[in-house]
């Protein structure tokens, strides 16, 4: 039982590790962003959807959005809104822009309130105006530093996620 047995054992261990890695992604928490399309001068909405970890109700969340300032405009810090089902759970969203440069705005948001969990699915909508001088093509918007607290008061981290706002030609 020399090399062939070792090879089969290595193959088996590799398969188990691969399956564990794949299934972990299937059951992990995640955030997703919609990818809107519009022309310069028009408004778009980026919707954020939540997938909670199994057996973990999310009570509150915090995240940052990196928004390219030369192509997209925030009307104000109230541009982020909780959807109706989230409001019905007693939650509200509050945002601020703690960092702003010529190239980008960092918008930090907190979604919290009440004792009910945040329902899975669409949770917020961010309204942005495509600036008149925006060139046709994709504009990258990034959600980062997202963390949540579960019903059992455990910290839940989320991977960064990106989307694109596609600017159509006029």
Predicted regions and their residues:
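Bacterial N-terminal signal peptides that target proteins for export
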Residues: 2-13
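Bacterial N-terminal signal peptides
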Residues: 11-25
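Generic detector of intrinsically disordered, low-complexity segments in short proteins
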Residues: 1-4, 168-170
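Acidic, low-complexity intrinsically disordered segments
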Residues: 25-170
